[in-house]
Amino acid sequence: HDEHVRVVEAVIEAVDDVPVIAGTGSNNTREALELSERAADAGADALLLISPYYNKPEQRGLIDHYRTIADAVDLPQIVYNVPSRTGRNIEPDTAVELASHESIAGYKAASGDLGQIGEIAERTTDEDFAVLSGDDALTLPTISVGGTGTISVAANIEPERTCAMVGAALDGDYERARQLHHELGPLFRELFVETNPIPVKEAMQIRGYGPARMRSPLTRLAEEYREDLE
C-alpha cells in the first residue's frame, strides 16, 4: 500500500494542477477503502475503482462495496467494469442504482457489450453521471450510444488524435471521428496483442518515456510484436 500511495503522490507532484484520478480498487472492501482514503489524503481529485475480482460477489455485494467507499471518502468515484479480468459483470440495474449516489460520478465500461453500455447511458441520462469507454476500439461506438468520453490506453501514445476523435464524436462530427478511429485502429490492435499493459509500456519506451520493465509474472513484449509497434 505504501508504494501504491507513493505512486499517486509522485504523479500529483509531476502534473502540478492537472486533475489526478487514482486507481484504488481491490478485491475486498476494507483494502479498497484504505487505498481510497490514502489517495484522498495524498491529494487525488477522484477515484477509479475496479470491481472486486476473483471472489465474484453478488450484485448486492457490489452495491454495498461501492456505497461504503463513496460514503466514507469525499471524492468523486468512477466504477470500473471489466468482467474479462474480474470474473463478475456489473449489471445495468446495479450501475443505475450506484449512479444515484452523489459521490459516484461515472462508469468505465470495458465489458465489450455495447447493448449494456447503451442501456446504462440511457437510464442515467438524468443523473450527473459519465459513461466512459474503457476499450479504445469501442470508444467511438460507446459515444454513439450515449457515452461521454474515454479512459484510454492509446492516449498514452497518441493523446492528440485520441482527444480529437472523442471531441469530434461529442460534437456530432462522426465523419471526422470515424476517420480518426480508422487511423488509430492499427494502434488500438497493437496495444492489445498481449496483456495490457505490456504493449503500451513497450510503446512508451519506444517513444522515450522510460524502460519497459515489468514485474513478474508479467514479461516484456514478445520480439515478434516489437517491430510492428515501432
How should each PLM-predicted stretch be described?
Residues I21, G147, A154-E230:
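C-terminal alpha-helical cap/extension of soluble enzyme domains
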Residues H1-G87:
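Active-site beta->alpha loop and helix N-cap motifs at the rims of alpha/beta catalytic domains
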Residues S51, V79, G87, S111, ...:
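Generic secondary-structure boundary/loop-capping signal
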Residues V11, A39, I69, Y107, ...:
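Conserved, mostly hydrophobic/aromatic
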Residues A72, P83-E183, F188:
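Catalytic alpha/beta core domains of metabolic enzymes, predominantly
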Residues H4, V8, A32, Y66, ...:
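A general structural signal for well-ordered alpha-helical segments in protein cores
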